[in-house]
Amino acid sequence: MRNLKLRYCKELNAVAHPQHLLLQPELNGGASDIYFVVADNKIYAVQESGDVRLKVIADLPDIVGVEFLQLDNAICVASGAGEVILVDPQTGATSEGTFCDVGIESMAWSPNQEVVAFVTRTHNVVLMTSTFDVIAEQPLDAELDPDQQFVNVGWGKKETQFHGSEGKQAAKQKESDSTFIRDEQELNQDVSISWRGDGEFFVVSYVAAQLGRTFKVYDSEGKLNHTAEKSANLKDSVVWRPTGNWIAVPQQFPNKSTIALFEKNGLRHRELVLPFDLQEEPVVQLRWSEDSDILAIRTCAKEEQRVYLYTIGNYHWYLKQVLIFEQADPLALLHWDTRCGAEHTLHVLKESGKHLVYRWAFAVDRNNSIVGVIDGKRLLLTDFDEAIVPPPMSKIVLKFETYINAFISHGTSLWVYTCDRKIYLNEHIHTLGKELQKPIMLMPDAELSGLHLANLTHFSPHYLLATHSSAGSTRLLLLSYKDNDNKPGEWFYRVHSSVRINGLVNAVAVAPYAMNEFYVQTVNNGHTYEVSLKADKTLKVERSYVQLHEPADQIDWVIVKGCIWDGYTGALVTLRNQHLLHIDGYRIGEDVTSFCVVTNYLVYTQLNAMHFVQLDDRRQVASRNIERGAKIVTAVARKARVVLQLPRGNLEAICPRVLVLELVGDLLERGKYQKAIEMSRKQRINLNIIFDHDVKRFVSSVGAFLNDINEPQWLCLFLSELQNEDFTKGMYSSNYDASKQTYPSDYRVDQKVEYVCRLLEQQMNRFVSRFRLPLITAYVKLGCLEMALQVIWKEQQEDASLADQLLQHLLYLVDVNDLYNVALGTYDFGLVLFVAQKSQKDPKEFLPYLNDLKALPIDYRKFRIDDHLKRYTSALSHLAACGEQHYEEALEYIRKHGLYTDGLAFYREHIEFQKNIYVAYADHLRAIAKLDNASLMYERGGQLQQALLSAKHTLDWQRVLVLAKKLSEPLDQVAQSLVGPLQQQGRHMEAYELVKEHCQDRKRQFDVLLEGHLYSRAIYEAGLEDDDVSEKIAPALLAYGVQLESSLQADLQLFLDYKQRLLDIRRNQAKSGEGYIDTDVNLKEVDLLSDTTSLHSSQYSGTSRRTGKTFRSSKNRRKHERKLFSLKPGNPFEDIALIDALHNHVTKIAQQQQPVRDTCKALLQLANAADADPLAAALQREFKTLLQAVDAALDEIWTPELRGNGLMADHLTGPNVDYLALQKEQRYALLSPLKRFKPQLIMMDWQHEILQ
């Protein structure tokens, strides 16, 4: 649905009577400002400025073909006499290429300029290489081999065909060849050659004896491949579409004129019906654009010459442009530009020497949701807001008297610009379905009647903009229209104001709402200028807005919501032909094929994806896949719809989530909750967004929300979809800024469902008759099924049919068995029967049970019901109300369900029975090894002996002594029985306290202190009693000091040994280069990988995981761990075992700071012992040496690769995987995450200054 928009028409001065045009590309791929024109058998070099270099490069008679050879930087010229020469365009020097003694009729080079085809005057086809070596030569009238000729298999005989109005007699008539011209001398005898775009085949059109005009297809080796099927009245022009699917040839029929399209095999495929008669307006030239998008047809009539430009879409040919030229200055030739980036540039040379350069670009003419397509004299309009009408159909067709070249649609106005430079204006297009008024015809004034207007654009209700280029500059024209004073009833348009800009303007953009300024871009340097309309209606160039590195083919000024850049609330969007998209010069994307602006989003497409960019911060917020090659036609903001056209021409309408959310948000901002929910339901948007969009607004306007929703079912749907999640920060975060979201003070996201349901429930309870269904749904979401049933049961008393409907709704939300149980839990048998009857339950299942319950006392009935519903606490409360006769049942029920605390609360007034509960509770606690609590419960239950035993097991010696006293047991004996167990658990100080209080034996007291190495306390006690410290304590303390010193030395040696073994293993592995795992180690046995890693060895496949060991038993797993972390030399995982052992050893060393300090202090207190001070100094020195050795080696043992440090993202994943590092990571995963990091040595002040 694209139209051809004229970007500029540049007028140059060339050479009169031109015959050929040669364009010279630069070596870097750009366009040179020098081109060559062949005129009057001379070659001229012409500059873009229009100055003609009068030096004749070559002068040959009867030039029949010419080509600029890029690789040789030479011009190849063929003459009718048979000469083929090469001309140097710089010096004019010539060299002979080849010579044909019989003369040359036509010459054509292949597109890649590797092969050249000639047709001689004797109708021989000669194929040569670029160095003029003959590849093949054969007569033009040679026949195909028998195996390549067309075969008639007898299908479709004339006798069996339907002949319509001619009747059956037509079947008996013999086929006449009268349609073929017998005298081929009457035909144009020119021979035409055309190559396919890939250079593999070429076609030769000529006049054959007995057949008339026909053509043949040859390959690049000169072999005849196909001949055309018999076709009458073919014309002499022939051109092969560069993409290669069609060969175009004009063809005349009695009732129509066409461009016949043949396939490579010579069979007629389809046709393009021309809007004129070839007899009156014959085709002079056929030319395809280099990209095969546009077919140019040049015709010549008596009064004028025309150029028709056709495009194809969805198998329909659209006539997009018609150029009209007077016979007073006829056309000489057409030539499509073949240079890169200029595929839609057409060069038109006139006999007078004028050179017109037309530059078109494809663009979609859209006015909001209305899109128009030009097709000859018809304008096809479709409003995509109302319907998706696939092309070539449309909702409405406007017909005009002449061909349409451009049209403008803005608001309710429509301007149509025709090929005869008239403008038709219709100012009242409201809807396309209504009858349109007859448009006003605006005639051009004398100045505009001879100008080629480009970039025709709407500017204001009474003005249009256009451009006209000449002599290297461009005039910006402000067009106005008025009534003709001389001829009442006639209107004309004229130039109201103009301003000239240096360079060629190829794009114009007008701000949608600021109608006093617009922007233009020049193709020469990529400058974009801001032009304003002054109060006196004159145009003025204000400034250079932005400088692009390369000029764009499409620019668009867009309004940016809530953003001001440099004082302007807008931005310039530009799209280059190389598919680069920019906003104010900032690159947004590349490989962009189309774009449009919808609300606050820039939507653009790439080959198979669509992206959405927020205009205010230029942030890409979303993307989605589309069909390959699809392009944007238009977007309908009010329906969040984007219309795409696929490569084959059909349309696809989608509603992207980003646009739908934008529309829903706008509706919510305006309080249109009904429409917001309707749009969300239609587009499958989660209804949580209704609340999450603006929580504070929703809470404050909950009444308006309920009043605006007409459908109770929609409220039910809203409530049922609620989740404890903020969708503006999760699923729909693309449309929201998390920093701007605010909540009420009493709101929490993790309690969102309860919060919203409570909020709505309070409002809906005021109008229960209107919100019955949503109220029931809210109770279900809150888990208050009983309240939902009460609402239904209340309606049952007034309207049974309505209650049935409400119950059916509830049964849709809740399982029938759960609902039956809830009804049973209300103890209302009427409600139970009502639910049971509607739930399709078998009466044989519930009626006997209900009858049995009715026969029971009320409290015991409630107990049975609660027990059935597994509401054990409530059941026990009802059982407690039944009295003393149910004590035994209650005690058994408490034991069965573990309701000890509840039972104690319910039977608080039953003192004696409560003691039974205490004892039962104590038995339970003792069974689960909670002996301290069991002792307390036994005491409350009056069983002091059991309380004493339980306290003894926990070594709660203070409580044991208290209970022993209550039981009148000897305290000294009880205390002596506790000393040994306390010492076994390392509680030496508590054992000493018992001995000191209940045993008067001083030796026994000191023995307890010395066995616990509590030397400082022993010295303290000895000092208080004036005992001899050196006699009682010194020997033991000195012996312990010597032992501790030996232990520290052993710890140091063990640490150094482990460290050295680890370093040796790492050094050997680094030298071998085989990683950490030997080739004979089977990783299938390694099942201790950490849960924190997801890595697996390449050997550790899915099969090996299924067949490997599982170690379900904890005993087996511990056994396997011991085997895996064995420190035995030669273990495949010895390095892992050493790291594990070192971590444990360092942790143990760090914990010895306090014992070493205390021991040294005690030794210092032995002033009379000669060996005490040296031993204390040695202890401190040994321990300091040990700590220094450990601290210095930590970083050497726990290396960065062992710690990880983000290596996963660097080389363990992605396309470039370091498999050696991956293998190491798998081994390190065997360690617990804690042991992969070095131990933290928390140092205390353990040293004594006097021992330094």
UniProtKB/Swiss-Prot annotation:
The gene is Elp1. Residues 1106-1116 have a biased composition (Basic residues). The keyword Nucleus applies. PANTHER family: ELONGATOR COMPLEX PROTEIN 1. InterPro entries: A-sol_ELP1 (IPR056167), Elp1 (IPR006849), ELP1_b-prop_2 (IPR056165), ELP1_N_b-prop_1 (IPR056164), HB_ELP1 (IPR056169), TPR_ELP1 (IPR056166), WD40/YVTN_repeat-like_dom_sf (IPR015943). It is found in: Cytoplasm; Nucleus; Cytoplasm, Cytoskeleton, Spindle. It comes from Drosophila melanogaster (Fruit fly). The keyword Transit peptide does not apply. GO terms for molecular function: tRNA binding. GO terms for cellular component: cytoplasm; cytosol; elongator holoenzyme complex; microtubule; nucleus; spindle. Homodimer. Component of the elongator complex composed of Elp1, Elp2, Elp3, Elp4, Elp5 and Elp6. The elongator complex associates with and stabilizes microtubules; efficient interaction requires the full complex. Residues 1111-1129 are annotated as: Required for binding to tRNA. It comes from the Eukaryota. Pathway: tRNA modification; 5-methoxycarbonylmethyl-2-thiouridine-tRNA biosynthesis. Residues 1097-1116 are annotated as: Disordered. Component of the elongator complex, which is required for multiple tRNA modifications, including mcm5U (5-methoxycarbonylmethyl uridine), mcm5s2U (5-methoxycarbonylmethyl-2-thiouridine), and ncm5U (5-carbamoylmethyl uridine). The elongator complex catalyzes formation of carboxymethyluridine in the wobble base at position 34 in tRNAs. ELP1 binds to tRNA, mediating interaction of the elongator complex with tRNA. Binding by the elongator complex stabilizes microtubules and promotes their growth. Belongs to the ELP1/IKA1 family. This is Elongator complex protein 1. Keywords: Cytoplasm, Cytoskeleton, Microtubule, Nucleus, Phosphoprotein, tRNA processing. The modification Phosphoserine is found at S1094. GO terms for biological process: dosage compensation by hyperactivation of X chromosome; establishment of mitotic spindle asymmetry; long-term memory; tRNA wobble base 5-methoxycarbonylmethyl-2-thiouridinylation. Residues 814-1252 are annotated as: Mediates dimerization. Disruption phenotype: RNAi-mediated knockdown is lethal in larval third instar (L3) stage. RNAi-mediated knockdown in sensory organ precursor cells abolishes central spindle asymmetry during asymmetric cell division. RNAi-mediated knockdown in adult mushroom body neurons impairs protein synthesis-dependent long-term memory formation. Its main location: cytoplasm.
